[in-house]
């Protein structure tokens, strides 16, 4: 067979080569301290060829075992630092946190869907980001605000339990049900109501998540602007995002019409207990009252709302799915968890949030799930300026990948790290707050996830209800040891196969009287 190179592909390759040669002439190498060790780089593509054919966090872990916990890669033209140990994570998240406080820029999909980085997750470190963080801590995701969504959580989870109960003895796709549940909770918290249009919004958001996993050459060579313009992905993302934007525009318009002013007694209620406002109301109030020193347009509000769905739902959805899968694979853990929740809520017939703090073993299960299966296995940062770690030079504008998945399976800190053992967290001081660098499922430092309490609230109650009301069997007579625990990596690390289970109501459940 004759191998033919298209003229267009050759021109692109030739253009990249000329661009990189010109860049090297413009920025000649200086006699500086060395970069961290790493595998040899090929011309133009660097180490790009070594990152294909598997899950990135697995590949990076394997490379770090040869080149060390502080490793340098070249991904296209991007200088990339990979962190794979607790000690190096501390350097990034604490010692040099200010130097590593940016998020990666010039990512095609994220640039479009975040309205040019106007959201919380992807905005660059500076005055605007600091103001957004303050808004999150005081208004959007404060303890009072999260508590104000308690009715939404309890009502939504109870409805899912009723749906499962109506299918007792039949196979249910628990993965799909969990996804629908968490999206529904977030939609009601953000928009105040649930409608068919919000279902369309969720479908579009899922499509963007899928597109975000596509390999984009322009992301590897951001200095070559023509690559982004020529990318077929740009058209697809812009087409989907246009529909998302239309829905968000309608939502903002409706909220403005329905909630022009707030009476004084409502303001007092807002201050005392989180009020009845949804998140769109809160953002519109901030805009109307001029509480931001930096510009705060409708685009900023829409970017933040989209954040709530993309970042605010995936972690909880994936964690509940993984936790149930791990308990199905480890019947000993399932049995102990069911006994705990049924004892704590004995005689009540249902589970609410009043006694969740008493479920210590369930809390340990959640922590262990997020250790073995962190929703974001790689925490991404970008350096603001050059710094030095362990005698190595860390360039400015370098991409940084903290392999949280590898660190949380480090046998130096976690005995028998690949086994699911919630008991390791009983009596342990290790928590989600980012101060224990061997365990950072929500990141750490100044850019730690601001929605930890919101995420955990959306994980605890569904799990407690699933454990309380039902005994579970794997579909098709599958044995626990046969359950497929393979993962796929999109914008988060989720199970490859949906979790198909057969529910049977437990005698303590009062659901049958409610269905």
From Swiss-Prot:
Keywords: Alkaloid metabolism, Endoplasmic reticulum, Glycoprotein, Heme, Iron, Membrane, Metal-binding, Monooxygenase, Oxidoreductase, Transmembrane, Transmembrane helix. The keyword Oxidoreductase applies. Gene3D superfamilies: Cytochrome P450. The keyword Lyase does not apply. It comes from the Eukaryota. It catalyses: (-)-tabersonine + reduced [NADPH--hemoprotein reductase] + O2 = lochnericine + oxidized [NADPH--hemoprotein reductase] + H2O + H(+). It is a single-pass membrane protein. Pathway: Alkaloid biosynthesis. GO terms for cellular component: endoplasmic reticulum membrane. Heme binds at residue 449. Glycans are attached at residues 173, 259, 352. Its cofactor is heme. Its EC number is 1.14.14.-. One of its GO terms (biological process) is indole alkaloid biosynthetic process. It is found in: Endoplasmic reticulum membrane. Mainly expressed in aerial organs, including stems, leaves and flowers. InterPro entries: Cyt_P450, Cyt_P450_CS, Cyt_P450_E_grp-I, Cyt_P450_sf. Component of the monoterpenoid indole alkaloids (MIAs, e.g. echitovenine, tabersonine, lochnericine, 19-hydroxytabersonine and horhammericine) biosynthetic pathway; MIAs are used in cancer treatment and other medical applications. Cytochrome P450 catalyzing the conversion of tabersonine to lochnericine. Belongs to the cytochrome P450 family. This is Tabersonine 6,7-epoxidase isoform 2. It comes from Catharanthus roseus. The lineage of its organism: Eukaryota, Viridiplantae, Streptophyta, Embryophyta, Tracheophyta.
């Amino acid at each position: 067979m004759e191998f033919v190179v298209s003229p267009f592909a050759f021109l692109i390759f030739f253009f990249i080569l000329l661009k990189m040669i010109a860049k090297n002439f413009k920025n000649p190498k200086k006699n500086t301290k060395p970069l961290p060790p790493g595998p040899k780089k090929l011309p133009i593509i660097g180490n790009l060829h070594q990152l294909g054919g598997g899950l990135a966090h697995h590949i990076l872990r394997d490379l770090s075992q040869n080149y060390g916990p502080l490793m340098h890669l070249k991904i296209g033209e991007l200088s990339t630092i990979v962190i794979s140990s607790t000690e190096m994570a501390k350097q990034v998240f604490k010692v040099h946190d200010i130097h590593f406080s940016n998020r990666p820029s010039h990512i095609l999909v994220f640039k479009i869907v975040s309205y040019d980085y106007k959201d919380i997750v992807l905005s660059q470190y500076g005055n605007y980001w600091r103001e957004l963080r303050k808004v999150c801590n005081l208004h959007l995701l404060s303890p009072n605000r999260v508590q104000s969504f308690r009715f939404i959580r309890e009502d939504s989870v109870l409805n899912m339990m009723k749906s499962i109960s109506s299918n007792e003895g039949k196979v249910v796709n628990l993965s799909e049900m969990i996804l629908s549940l968490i999206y529904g909770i977030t939609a009601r918290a953000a928009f105040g109501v649930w409608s068919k249009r919000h279902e369309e919004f969720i479908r579009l958001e899922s499509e963007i998540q899928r597109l975000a996993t596509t390999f984009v050459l322009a992301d590897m060579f951001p200095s070559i602007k023509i690559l982004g313009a020529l990318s077929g992905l740009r058209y697809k993302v812009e087409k989907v995002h246009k529909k998302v934007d239309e829905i968000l525009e309608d939502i903002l318009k409706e909220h403005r019409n329905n909630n022009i002013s707030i009476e004084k007694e409502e303001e007092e209620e807002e201050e005392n207990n989180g009020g009845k406002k949804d998140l769109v109301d809160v953002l519109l109030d901030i805009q109307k009252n001029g509480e931001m020193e930096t510009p705060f347009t409708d685009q900023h509000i829409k970017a933040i709302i989209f954040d709530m769905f993309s970042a605010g739902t995936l972690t909880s959805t994936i964690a509940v799915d993984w936790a149930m899968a791990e308990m199905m694979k480890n019947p000993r853990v399932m049995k102990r968890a069911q006994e705990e929740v049924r004892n704590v809520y004995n005689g009540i017939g249902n589970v609410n949030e009043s006694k969740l703090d008493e479920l210590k073993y369930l809390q340990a299960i959640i922590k262990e799930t997020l250790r073995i299966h962190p929703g974001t296995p790689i925490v991404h940062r970008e350096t603001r300026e050059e710094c030095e770690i362990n005698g190595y030079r860390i360039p400015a504008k370098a991409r940084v990948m903290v392999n949280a998945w590898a660190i949380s399976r480090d046998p130096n800190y976690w005995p028998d790290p690949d086994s699911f053992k919630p008991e390791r967290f009983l009596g342990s001081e290790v928590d989600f707050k980012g101060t224990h660098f061997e365990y950072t499922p929500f990141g750490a430092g100044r850019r730690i996830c601001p929605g930890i309490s919101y995420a955990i609230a959306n994980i605890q109650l569904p799990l407690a209800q699933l454990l309380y009301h039902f005994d579970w069997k794997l579909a098709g007579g599958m044995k626990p040891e046969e359950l497929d625990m393979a993962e796929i990596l999109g914008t988060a690390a989720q199970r490859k196969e949906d979790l198909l289970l057969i529910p049977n109501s437990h005698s303590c459940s009062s659901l049958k009287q409610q269905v």
